[in-house]
Amino acid sequence: MNALIDNRVLALAGVVQALQQVRQIAETGQSETSAVRTAIDSVLRIDAESPEAVYGGIRNLTQGLQLLHDYFGNQLRDQLLPRLTLAVLQLERRFIRDTSIVAAVSTGITQAAHQVEQTGDSAHPEILSTLGALYANTISHLRPRIIVQGNPHYLGQAGVVAEIRAMLLAALRSAVLWRQLNGNLLDFLLTKRAMAAATERALR
């Protein structure tokens, strides 16, 4: 049981870490390249052998795990982040039921993977633009849409919007993994203590 919860927490950390970048980009127009790369790589690693492998190792999720630790300890400063996380976890349910959108996203991710082979960098602006467009043309049609609040100056810039959408796609990918590991919204009520303990284990 511990192993399942441990893996589920990694997936949830992936969601939160990607969404933290969404919040940061929306407010400042800037992102953390390492976090963006971890998020985009997780989108491209469709057939990874384990949740840890999806993110290239637990260390790459340190930021997300720390955010979860703060949340479980009632010390999270950004009160919009939990709401955004809940919205993405709910979006995952609508996404997975729409087989045509799932197929389109899968095809788009495969094309992006080939593009990464050419650029050699998953965090390259061209890749972010491609994945951002993929999100806009597919997932953004699901209702209700994810609403991102931030600085209008940055939210009016095409490159910023593309990166935000790419990060939302990455968050959704982690949400799908979370659900595949039997994640459920009731976990936050029924297994919150176990999830907090798993978060602490991952941070050691």
UniProtKB/Swiss-Prot annotation:
Localization, UniProt: Cytoplasm; Cell inner membrane
Principal location listed in the UniProt entry: cytoplasm
InterPro entries in the cross-refs: HflD, HflD-like_sf
Coiled coil region boundaries: none
Pfam families per the UniProt record, alphabetical: DUF489
Bilayer topology: Peripheral membrane protein
Top-rank lineage group of the source organism: Bacteria
Record bears the keyword Cytoplasm: yes
GO CC, alphabetical: cytoplasm; plasma membrane
Keyword line: Cell inner membrane, Cell membrane, Cytoplasm, Membrane
Assigned protein family: Belongs to the HflD family.
NCBIfam families assigned to the protein according to its UniProt record, in alphabetical order: PRK00218.1-2 (NF001246), PRK00218.1-6 (NF001250)
Protein name: High frequency lysogenization protein HflD homolog
Protein's organism: Xylella fastidiosa (strain Temecula1 / ATCC 700964)
